[in-house]
From Swiss-Prot:
Region Transferase: start-end pairs: 1293-1526
Induction (free text): Expressed in copper depleted conditions via the regulation of the macA transcription factor.
Biased composition (Low complexity): 352-381
Function: Isocyanide synthase-NRPS hybrid; part of the crm gene cluster that mediates the biosynthesis of a yet unidentified copper-responsive metabolite. Converts valine into valine isocyanide that then contributes to two distinct biosynthetic pathways under copper-limiting conditions. Reaction of valine isocyanide with the imine intermediate of festuclavine results in formation of the amide bond in fumivaline A. In addition, valine isocyanide contributes to biosynthesis of a family of acylated sugar alcohols, the D-mannitol-derived fumicicolins.
Record pathway: Secondary metabolite biosynthesis
Region (Isocyanide synthase domain): 1-502
Record region (Adenylation): 573-752
UniProt-recorded name of the protein: Isocyanide synthase-NRPS hybrid crmA
Annotated keywords: Isomerase, Ligase, Oxidoreductase, Phosphopantetheine, Phosphoprotein
Length: 1537
């Protein structure tokens, strides 16, 4: 009998072990331990013939991470599969042992969180699915507390605190030292690490990071909470042991100590085993798999399945054609997790002490705790993406080294051994492709791993045979063609006992010799097939060295029969050996050598071990670098990025590197050729090439399929590179030659220009002045793996990089490079000007600093360009510590024959360039001190005398001009900007022309003849208009004054509106702008400036002070309803001034800071309330919408702002950009006719009426003109009621304003989800399309649900919802229309969709966005002009109607201000903070809430978020906030309901 019981017990244990969690290798001792620990428990039940009772603490609550992990808050298919698996296990036990097995699931969620609905739904699921072998228990069942038998949620939740308190009072051990247990008990440590990862990955969605929650404090809080959870978990374990003393103890976690049977709840090939932390998907073959929901969502081969109206799981779609199905080779989430050895995972961090018998290992964690999450074969438990903290002696994730069957941890692998291993295991894998031009096309020569490894060995033997093996590692200098020999030589040197030293050919001879001397380099290698560059020849003349001739590349690659050249060092032996040598750029002096040790390079390998960064969800920069990805780098091999991207990253990440073509400098044409000829996944580019790519859209579009571009080596232009980022993600990296890339994280796409760094990097940003921080690094415990710079400087504890950064205004962990702390910070900013190649501030020891600018095109110095550059300089001045440190007269330009000295990465060498321009700078300052004009007698009597005087003036700076002809180009003779400045200074003084002549006149007229002619012309004009000659020429002066008065009177003539103006009915366009006020500034000062600035704007644009009136019925061609603008005549202009109204509401409304903190909530105050609150100004503006559209309003505000700045002392604020014809409402009709767009009405497609807010005349509705639709014709005008009046009477029940926020992260998620949706058919909708589609669908769904669910309305299948989008037609109308034209140029882009389709769960946002994109494509110049023709033909304006008028319908209008450039509106910084730029600008919505359905998308927030505002009834709002799709992306921030 005893043997029978033992046999049955073994069978039962075997069945349970088939369901075991095996995330560590099943070591024999562990299996023996399982039998030893658990067989006696099972045998007791079997001997008694009773049912085996097991308990499993599990199923606490659904993860809070609904962005990436799970589908919702309630159990779904994942839980169902887990319960079924447990139930099936019990059923199988019953087959061999009839009493069977029952599992009691003890919901431990209450130990850590208040949960009820999840547990109740789980019980209902078990009952519905008849999982009869599973029972449930809650924590209250473990405690002796009187409660009702049938307990409600209210009673249960009300007693949560009591439950926890009783648990701790009864079972907490006073002598528990939790830190000691973590250090000594492997099970406790496993659970602790799991808790930390769970907390760090999930709590950020409950308690988002912000200004008052730093990365450090967040991590610290999570560690504290994890320990508290362990303490409660220990008490919970003791309670279970007490309540279930004889039960078989199951656990969802690995148990190193073997005290629990570890169970895998999900039987999938991935490592995701806890259903409350993942989602499941069913493949086409019926197999179930598990992974984070976010991974499934990205795979367009999967579709989301709903059950009972809630998302349940994913399902593989039917395969189409030859499309690949989902398999391990085509889906990254299916890569099997690699089992870790428990000893490797924990052993190195645990001292040799026995497991404490008193510590009951908690198993109530809500996440798996076994190891770090890794992609690919090194993954263990990828339920979170945060590997535990570890030190050099701690956790080491391992990679297989198949060459010696040893496991080598990431961060401790040696580059030569990685390649030898690859050649042995995957000899045919292509590791390099060598590009060559064949005619105009590229050809590629593939290099396999075997061929490459053989070539390395051949090169190593060649070197060894030439010079033998040195006693210690010696440098080998090399400058050669940009081909694969750089890579081969690097590897070969390491194997042969040397280290390659790559010198830049741009070094000076002095600099190169300094590096060679510092490294004691006595061995030089030249490529045998090319002549050495001049630098090498000069160096070899001054420093005798042993010179070798490196064979040609083809010879080295022909290495089939080469014997292996072994490299057998261990990492600990090689850690401090130099892998190669580079050197500093020499920007501030002679370059210095930098050895790259194997330890330093190991930090690049260890990046994959980093947990998520400062914001939790920001991944390390190498996250998306996948095996087999193709990379191309434009960096030279003498630059650190060239070594990293061509040698290190391909080896460490198994990349396929494209190299060459040799002899071709990377340029935009080569990028174009590469993009066309092969697929490049990862581009690594110098900053200048990234910028050029942004200005070359034809090439940029060809890179769209690539993953991203790594930009490094210096700052990129935020404008040009920003254009690149819109097409292909720009990964903006920063690093140092001494430390490589340390801690770079990937910020959200919209923040691509900013840097974010991982806490392990040890970076500190010390504030040195407001908005300026100095970059430091401090050694920490993670330095061996993540702080490479301390491998280079092992003696240092802290290092000042001397780089300056600016902090993101709303995201405190994001930083932007500002400059060097030992340079003036203005240089970095000024260089962002698109026309500037580089600049240097000079003048140390001088009373006034100067600026030397190197232009990209030194011959283009137009007046507009110079003004534009000066604006940038002024902005730089405002950012600097000292105001106005650069003056316009102290800006000079580099000469074409003396380009700035630069490093390989394109950075300006300051000292070398200043030395090059030393004489120039001295002449520059002399030219500012000399005053030739006071003594020069300029004869203006004739053209000849003017030319003679010009020649003499120029000769002071340009002696050769004396002998040149009058038509010789002065710049060809050598005239530079100093000479230009000196000449202009003299001419101004000698001729009396003053500022009427400037440097631009010389640049535009660069010969003596042309310059003399322009001087004569300017002098004549000055003479006729001079105010100083009133007595001498009274007639001419009166004439000029009369001309000015005529112009002013013309500008005040009343005018009628044109046909386009009536697209907007006669009503006000209300806008509200929010400005912070500087400390110490009074409301009266601000008001006076605004009032005076507005009056000055009325002088500039008199029509703004006018009044809209009805046209006279006696007028020729009068049509009823015609309107005109009447403007006060000049004599009564003062009557229209002082329009602003002063209100001090500081005692009524909250302060500006409070309003800002509340997001300027609409409910905080009425639209009618303005304008002063404590600390700020609320400026309410009302413009007539019939006379101006949105862009016209923008022009008006910009002019007002500039006039306010002028009154504050900004003499450049002259509104010179404003075209005088901007308010000429006759222009559209003139251009329409003169450009030939007018045509007969019968030729116009009747579908054009669909773009207008007017119904066709009655006779046309019954007798349409264009009966026959042709291919490509417009869709029919959508049908909606004609409203008899405008405006409609106000509804009795008005809508209430509600505001939602889509955060930057949610906006990116929305965009990603839409782009990934197959409904887009490969077309990428714009962000405006996506936001509008999202908003339209959500608003109509809410109304539809109210109508159908509450009002019980029914809709026919053909009932449609119409979306009206006011659309600016300026880009389509005429290039001759002034860009600042202010009149209305709008049409209505209408899109319609059946209501049931729009609101259906089967309709995606992507489908709606694609429809909007297709609708926008219908707008063409022909359509716009046809619309204008129809508007001109209207007999009146009484048939005005839009679909959104009224409240009881299913239509909407969206006013999309998303891309409204509020930053262009700057009211000055004398009184306003923030430069007078409004913090936000919004339309006044209250006025329309009773008359039409109006949705508004506010301008993009500074943090990249989007605010959506609409009017709702309360029941509609309730539907919105319960819409899972809508609330996935948007959250309500304010409502007036």
């Amino acid at each position: 009998m005893f043997h029978k019981e033992a046999g049955i017990s073994h069978l039962i244990l075997d069945i349970i072990l088939e369901h075991a969690l095996n995330k560590f290798d099943p070591a024999p001792d562990r299996l023996q331990g399982a039998a030893k620990n658990f067989l006696p428990i099972i045998e007791r039940f079997v001997a008694a013939g009773t049912r085996i009772e097991a308990c499993l603490p599990a199923f606490p609550f659904k993860s809070a991470n609904k962005v990436y992990k799970v589908l919702g808050s309630l159990p779904d298919k994942a839980e169902e599969l887990a319960l079924d698996r447990l139930n099936t296990m019990c059923a199988r036990v019953r087959e061999v042992y009839p009493p069977g097995l029952q599992v009691a699931i003890i919901s431990d969620g209450i130990t850590y969180n208040d949960t009820w609905a999840y547990g109740e739904a789980l019980r209902q699921m078990a009952a519905q699915k008849q999982f009869m072998y599973i029972v449930f228990s809650r924590i209250k069942d473990l405690l002796d507390i009187p409660l009702p038998e049938q307990m409600s949620e209210i009673v249960y939740v009300a007693n949560c605190t009591t439950f926890r308190r009783l648990l701790l009072n009864k079972y907490e051990r006073a002598d528990l030292d939790i830190d000691h247990e973590i250090a000594s008990n492997p099970d406790t440590k496993l659970t602790y690490l799991g808790y930390r990862r769970f907390l760090e990955s999930d709590l950020k969605y409950i308690f988002p990071r912000g200004a008052h929650r730093s990365a450090h404090s967040y991590k610290r809080d999570c560690k504290y909470l994890a320990k508290q959870m362990l303490i409660r978990g220990d008490a919970f374990a003791q309670a279970i042991k007490t309540s279930y003393p004889n039960h078989l103890r199951l656990s969802i976690h690995e148990s190193v100590a073997g005290t629990k049977l570890s169970i895998s709840l999900l039987n999938t090939k991935t490592g995701f085993t806890t259903p409350w932390h993942c989602s499941v998907a069913q493949l086409a073959n019926g197999e179930w798999i598990s992974a984070p929901m976010g991974e499934f969502r990205k795979d367009d081969r999967l579709e989301l399945v709903y059950a009972d109206g809630r998302p349940s799981h994913f399902r593989e779609k039917p395969r189409e054609g030859d499309a690949f199905g989902i398999s391990e080779s085509t889906a990254s989430y299916l890569q099997r997790p690699k089992r870790l050895r428990a000893s490797e995972y924990l052993g190195a961090t645990l001292p040799s002490v026995p497991v404490s018998p008193g510590m009951s290992s908690p198993s109530a964690a809500s996440t798996s705790s076994s190891g770090a999450s890794m992609q690919g074969s090194a993954a263990t438990t990828p339920e979170t993406h945060s590997p535990p903290t570890f030190t050099w002696s701690g956790l080491e994730i391992v990679a297989e080294d198949n060459s010696n069957n040893a496991s080598v941890p990431y961060g401790r692998r040696l580059i030569p051994q990685i390649m030898d291993s690859l050649a042995a295991t995957e000899p045919e894998r292509i590791v390099f492709s060598l590009a060559t031009f064949s005619g105009d096309s590229l050809e590629f020569r593939p290099i396999s791993a075997r061929t490459f490894a053989n070539a390395i060995d051949k090169t190593a033997w060649w070197l060894h045979n030439q010079v033998g093996r040195p006693d210690s590692i010696q440098p080998v200098g090399y400058i050669g063609p940009h081909d694969l020999r750089h890579v081969l030589l690097t590897y070969a040197c390491v194997k042969a006992g040397y280290a390659a030293l790559f010198l830049s050919p741009k070094n000076s001879t002095e600099g190169a010799l300094a590096v060679l001397e510092a490294t004691k380099c006595d061995l030089w290698i030249n490529a045998c097939d090319v002549s050495p560059v001049p630098l090498v020849k000069e160096v070899l003349q001054k420093r005798p060295m042993n010179v070798l001739q490196l064979p040609q590349l083809d010879e080295l690659l022909d290495a089939v029969s080469t014997d292996p050249f072994p490299y057998t060092k261990k990492f600990d032996e090689a850690i401090n050996d130099p892998f190669c040598f580079l050197h500093t750029s020499g920007t501030t002096g002679v370059p210095k050598p930098i050895p790259w040790s194997h330890g330093l390079i190991g930090t690049m390998d260890a990046v994959r071990l980093l947990p998520p960064g400062a914001d939790g969800d920001l991944p390390p920069w190498t996250t998306d670098w996948k095996t087999g990805d193709t990379i191309y780098s434009s960096f030279p091999m003498s630059h650190g990025a060239g070594i990293i991207m061509n040698i290190l990253m391909p080896a460490l990440f198994n990349l396929h590197c494209v190299f060459g073509p040799a002899g071709v400098l990377p340029n935009i044409n080569l990028v174009d050729a590469l993009a066309v000829s092969t697929r490049i996944d990862i581009w690594s580019m110098v900053p200048s090439l990234v910028d050029e790519l942004g200005e070359t859209p034809a090439v940029l579009s060809k890179l769209k399929s690539s993953k991203f571009i790594c930009a490094s080596g210096g700052p990129v232009s935020p404008v040009s590179a920003g254009k690149v980022n819109e097409v292909i993600r720009v990964l903006n990296l920063t690093g140092t030659t001494e430390g490589l890339f340390m801690g770079n994280l990937i910020p959200p796409r919209e923040d691509w220009f900013w840097f974010c760094f991982h806490p392990y990097s040890g970076f500190e940003f010390k504030q040195v002045e407001p908005d300026t921080y100095e970059h430091w690094v401090h050694r920490n415990e993670h330095w061996p793996l993540f702080q490479g710079i301390f491998h280079t400087f092992p003696e240092k504890q802290s290092i000042n990089f001397k780089d300056l950064y600016v902090r993101h205004p709303t995201k405190p962990n994001l930083w932007a490079f500002k400059g060097r702390s030992d340079d003036l910070v203005t240089e970095a900013f000024i260089t962002t000007h698109p026309a500037i190649k580089g600049c240097l501030v000079f003048g140390t020891g001088k009373p006034q600093a100067g600026l030397l600018i190197e232009l990209k095109d030194p011959l283009q110095k137009t007046d507009e360009l110079l003004d534009s550059i000066w604006e940038t300089v002024q902005q730089a001045n405002s950012m600097s510590r000292h105001k106005n440190q650069l003056l316009r007269d102290f800006v000079a330009f580099a000469t074409p024959d003396k380009p700035f000295c630069r490093t390989d990465k394109g950075t300006v060498k300051r000292s070398a360039t200043l030395k090059l321009y030393a004489d120039y700078i001295e002449r520059f300052y002399r030219s500012r001190n000399d005053d030739l004009g006071g003594t020069f007698d300029f004869d203006m009597s004739s053209a000849h005398s003017i030319e003679d005087n010009v020649r003499k003036i120029l000769a002071a700076s340009l002696p050769d001009v004396q002998e040149a002809s009058a038509d010789t180009d002065l710049f060809a003779l050598g005239l530079d900007s100093l000479g230009v400045f000196a000449a202009i200074k003299t001419i101004r003084a000698a001729t009396g022309l003053g500022d009427q002549i400037g440097p631009r006149h010389i640049y535009a007229n660069p010969t003596i003849a042309r310059l003399s002619a322009i001087i004569a012309l300017l002098a004549a004009a000055a003479e006729s208009a001079s105010d100083t000659t009133l007595c001498e020429r009274p007639v001419d002066d009166v004439g000029a004054q009369i001309a000015r008065m005529i112009a002013q009177h013309k500008a005040r003539q009343s005018f009628s509106l044109n046909a386009f103006d009536y697209v907007n009915p006669n009503h006000g366009m209300g806008l509200v702008l929010y400005f912070p006020i500087r400390d110490g500034v009074s409301y009266e000062q601000v008001f006076a400036n605004l009032q005076a600035g507005l009056n000055r704007t009325f002088d500039l644009i008199p029509a703004l002070s006018g009044k809209m009136t009805d046209c006279s019925e006696q007028g020729i061609g009068y049509t009823k309803g015609d309107l005109c603008v009447t403007i006060p005549p000049l004599a009564k202009a003062d009557s229209a001034r002082n329009r602003l109204v002063y209100k001090d509401l500081s005692a009524v409304l909250p302060s500006f800071d409070d309003l800002r903190k509340g997001g300027f909530a609409p409910s905080a105050f009425s639209d009618t309330l303005a304008n002063f609150v404590s600390g700020g100004c609320i400026l309410a503006v009302d413009l007539n919408h019939c006379c101006l559209d949105g862009l016209g309003a923008m022009v008006a505000l910009k002019a007002w702002a500039e006039n306010c700045r002028y009154l504050q002392g900004d003499q450049s604020a002259t509104c010179g950009w404003y075209d005088p014809e901007s308010f000429n409402h006759s222009l559209p009709e003139i251009l329409h006719r003169q450009e030939g767009w007018a045509r007969p009405l019968h030729e116009i497609d009747p579908g054009t009426w669909g773009f207008l807010p007017f119904f066709p005349p009655e006779d046309e509705e019954t007798n349409p003109r264009c009966e026959k639709a042709t291919e490509g014709s417009l869709p029919a005008r959508p049908i909606f009621p004609l409203h008899p009046v405008w405006p409609l009477p106000r509804a009795e029940r008005c809508l209430k304003t509600t505001m939602f926020l889509v955060t930057p992260e949610k906006l990116e998620l929305l965009q990603q989800d839409v782009i990934a949706d197959p409904a887009t058919n490969g077309i990428t909708p714009s962000i405006s399309d996506i936001v509008q589609a999202f908003f339209w669908r959500a608003a109509i769904k809410a109304r539809y649900r109210v109508a159908t669910e509450i009002r019980k309305q029914k809709f026919s299948p053909d009932a449609v919802s119409i979306l009206e989008l006011p659309t600016d037609t300026r880009p389509h109308f005429s290039s001759r229309l002034p860009p600042t034209y202010m009149g209305s140029m709008l049409i209505l882009n209408r899109t319609s969709m059946p209501i049931e389709t729009l609101c259906s769960a089967e309709t995606s946002i992507a489908k709606v966005a694609l429809l909007l994109r297709q609708s926008a494509a219908r707008i063409t110049p022909s359509l716009v002009h046809d619309a204008f023709t129809l508007l001109q033909s209207l007999p009146g304006h009484r048939r005005f109607s839009t679909a959104n008028m009224g409240l009881e319908h299913m239509h909407a209008m969206i006013s999309n201000m998303l891309l409204f450039p509020t930053s262009e509106i700057g009211f000055g910084d004398a009184f306003f903070a923030n430069g007078g730029v409004p913090e936000t600008m919004r339309p006044q919505l209250e006025r329309g809430n009773g008359r039409f359905r109006f949705l508004a998308v506010f301008p993009l927030r500074k943090d990249g978020g989007v605010e959506l505002v609409l009017g709702t009834h309360r029941e509609e709002l309730e539907m919105l906030v319960t819409d899972e799709e809508f609330t996935r992306y948007a959250r309500m921030v304010d409502t007036c309901c």
